[in-house]
Amino acid sequence: MAAAAVARRVVLVLVLAAASLAAAPRGAAARSLGGREGPGEVDADAAVDLNATNFDAFLKASLEPWAVVEFFAHWCPACRNYKPHYEKVAKLFNGRDAAHPGLILMARVDCASKVNIDLCNRFSVDHYPFLLWGPPTKFASAKWDPKQENNEIKLIDDGRTAERLLKWINNQMKSSFSLEDKKYENENMLPKNASDPEQIVQAIYDVEEATAQALQIILERKTIKPKNRDSLIRFLQILVARHPSKRCRRGSAELLINFDDHWSSNLSLSSQEGSKLLESVAEENHWICGKEVPRGYWLFCRGSKSETRGFSCGLWVLMHSLTVRIGDGESQSTFTSICDFIHNFFICEECRKHFYEMCSSVSAPFRTARELSLWLWSTHNKVNMRLMKEEKDMGTGDPLFPKVTWPPNQLCPSCYRSSKVTDGAVDWNEDAVYQFLVNYYGKKLVSSYKETYMESLQQQEKKIVSEDSSISNAASVPIGAALGVAIASCTFGALACFWRAQQKNRKQRKNWN
């Protein structure tokens, strides 16, 4: 028993060491391609729904200086009638298409949900709807007591209509916002804050969301078969080494350690078996990006309609973030892993086939991370151009987030060798494009995340984080980045031997009993 425990500990240390080594900062790391959140129309729920599991972390991570939180009950008729009023105001401040983005976070909490009872009591909620105003960090770190003087969190006592709520906010901020304010004079204009590097931090939440949803789809839709099992292993290995989220790297490592237990080589799942497997993965705390993910909503990738952007946007951001975090020696294997993953597990048939055709058209192996990053960027633009035409003909696109050639000239003038575009073809300066991706989706995406959201969510894991940090420090040596994946790959050979031995021990114990 003691030997088995030691062996398991050693294996986990090896996997985490590989992930820590491979995830060590590189000068050309962490960039992606994507778009910012934009809730859009009133019925698109501009306000962000929060609950007790993510309330503190989300508000602590908020970049806005102010927040309004509505506490309501879903069964309350007055709350249902009030929702359109609250959404009208939320539409002004939340998201890329907002008239006044980056000023106020508009959120909601359902106090009728059992998980939120203590949270609502913490803020002395005694009627519905109940609105509070204050700095997001104060919501995250304190409670509200109506008897307490000089409280930075204030009760909004006159916000029963959209007009009255906005008037209260205007009085508080000494502003003159109007419900008629619009973000764009032209719907194709680039948002004023699109080049703000502070906005990119929210992309990391959607990378986690896309990662968790991808695994959920694999389990629920029984897409894993014996023939594509290895491609999932290879993709998880990339996530262990290169995922921009530390929690997702750790979760991927845990899944790989227990891979044979959950997905045997002859596994073929029925729908019921897939649901049971999803439950078993959750019960054993193998949530790939944390137990509160998927959260069920998008930030950076939120569209103005419920059916636009979202998962596909998040998946693109994930793939781009992987390609720019690898070492040169990993470029070809990463390319193969991404292509195989989309081919085997992306369930949009037309998109899957089209992407794999572009993968198959590559004639020479990739030699550098730069080559792979630019190929994926070019591929993404080709997909956008194809979808732009289809969505225009069918009227199915997102009116506030039309497909565009990326990056637009407003964001990266140096990316264009000439301001003239001939027959839709752009004369790109690829060196500038790559540098743009490095700068726009670089260290800010990960560093801001670590300083805010991650710190809050991982308070309960201080011991684990401390051990992981020690491993990372011990493993930080000037070795080529490819060694990270090499170590991870070798580790899984040891894992297989270890788990086979453990399974034999389990059978013996059963016989003994």
Curated annotation (Swiss-Prot):
Catalytic activity reported: 2 R'C(R)SH + O2 = R'C(R)S-S(R)CR' + H2O2
Superkingdom to which the source organism belongs: Eukaryota
Binding site for FAD: 309, 316, 320, 350, 354, 377-384, 403, 406
The enzyme's E.C. designation: 1.8.3.2
Coiled coil: none
Sugar-modified residues: N51, N193, N266
Obligatory cofactor(s): FAD
Pfam families according to UniProt: Evr1_Alr, Thioredoxin
Domain ERV/ALR sulfhydryl oxidase, first and last residues per copy: 304-406
Active site annotation, chain numbering: C76, C79
Keywords: Disulfide bond, FAD, Flavoprotein, Glycoprotein, Oxidoreductase, Redox-active center, Secreted, Signal
Cystine residue pairs: C76-C79, C301-C313, C348-C351, C412-C415
PROSITE patterns, A to Z: ERV_ALR, THIOREDOXIN_1, THIOREDOXIN_2
Broad enzyme group: oxidoreductase
Cell location: Secreted
Gene Ontology molecular function: flavin-dependent sulfhydryl oxidase activity; protein disulfide isomerase activity
Domain Thioredoxin: start-end pairs: 31-174
InterPro entries linked: ERV/ALR_sulphydryl_oxid_sf, ERV/ALR_sulphydryl_oxidase, Sulfhydryl_oxidase, Thioredoxin-like_sf, Thioredoxin_CS, Thioredoxin_domain
Signal peptide: 1-30
Protein purpose: Catalyzes the oxidation of sulfhydryl groups in peptide and protein thiols to disulfides with the reduction of oxygen to hydrogen peroxide. May contribute to disulfide bond formation in a variety of secreted proteins.
Protein known as: Sulfhydryl oxidase 1
Organism name: Oryza sativa subsp. japonica (Rice)
